[in-house]
């Protein structure tokens, strides 16, 4: 028996906390054999006085002429003493509880108990009267049972928690790659839609026998896999232009431009489609005013392609014409402002000047004959020269009007204080009372 195999207990209990259950009390026979033998037949001590039944059952085994196991190895210190306290009586139930619930007996030396089973328990029969030793289970089974009182056994890693213990885990199925589907199309193998190349079908020929060469054969065979032509070095094979590889060209039927990809040709042909015509500008209501006798000095150049239907101005681009037409749709001034004319630009009051627009100048029609002019100065010059007899000047300001109602509205609006004084002067003065 190796040294230190039997545990020497002290009087002070070890600081180990454990629970004793009722089902453990009924398992008195599941004690390890070496613990039961050490307690029943100690070498240097007497059995406890409070257990007469255990003393009577252990008497035949103590009279056995075989020497005690501790004496075989010459280690008298390893013999365990009786496990009872001298200060208080020890009963049978307390001893069984101490041995059943002791973690040392179950956990300390589980492996050494099975190796020393042949030394402690020789084969005996029930005929000799050793009923206690014959009914004991093997040490390996008892140690496995008592081992369950301690720590929880770790679960097996191969068995899942929800699966049955007999079924084994299946390995995860491998994912199918998408490259398998691409190999089923023959066009993708023989045609390159990006490079515009295609491999022609070659004649099926039996493999030609290899000609014996006198010189040393290179490690790799430099043979074209399509036309089966052999080359002496890889550089010659790389420069080889195989006759089975043809270039596919996609030509535009309208401009004869060549493309190597059909998608590029389809994208190019969209430019040849006729675009829908642009929506024509809204025709103004007054189309009669577009005719002019003399060209305007402020109109566009003679090379212009787009002409304004109102003022006959010409523009190089249609966008400029659309922007110019917006200026004709601006709300007009009040009616009296159309009949108002100043003799010169210096005499025009700044307060009554129309707001400036960031658009080209609009045409100014003559209020008498209806002729249009591109600028205000041209209109005033025309009125002074041709319609000077039909003018109604204001006597309070240098403004001139073409009608009597227009002059009256102007006086009532712009000169109400002077007009009131004139009215008061015309009223006869009453004599004082």
UniProtKB/Swiss-Prot annotation:
Residue ranges with Basic and acidic residues bias: 19-28, 90-99, 284-295
Matching InterPro entries: INSM1/2, Znf_C2H2_sf, Znf_C2H2_type
Biased amino acid composition, Basic residues: 1-12
Annotated GO CC locations: nucleus; transcription repressor complex
SNAG domain: annotated span: 1-20
Pfam annotation, one family: zf-C2H2
Main location: nucleus
Disulfide cysteine pairs (residue numbers): none
Location of region: Disordered: 1-111, 131-175, 269-305
Task of the protein: May act as a transcriptional regulator. Plays a role in noradrenergic neuron, pancreatic and gastrointestinal endocrine cells differentiation during embryonic development.
UniProt cross-references to PANTHER family, sorted A to Z: INSULINOMA-ASSOCIATED 1 (PTHR15065), INSULINOMA-ASSOCIATED PROTEIN 1 (PTHR15065:SF5)
Family indicated by similarity: Belongs to the INSM1 family.
Protein name: Insulinoma-associated protein 1
Source organism of the structure: Xenopus laevis
Taxonomic lineage of the native organism: Eukaryota, Metazoa, Chordata, Craniata, Vertebrata
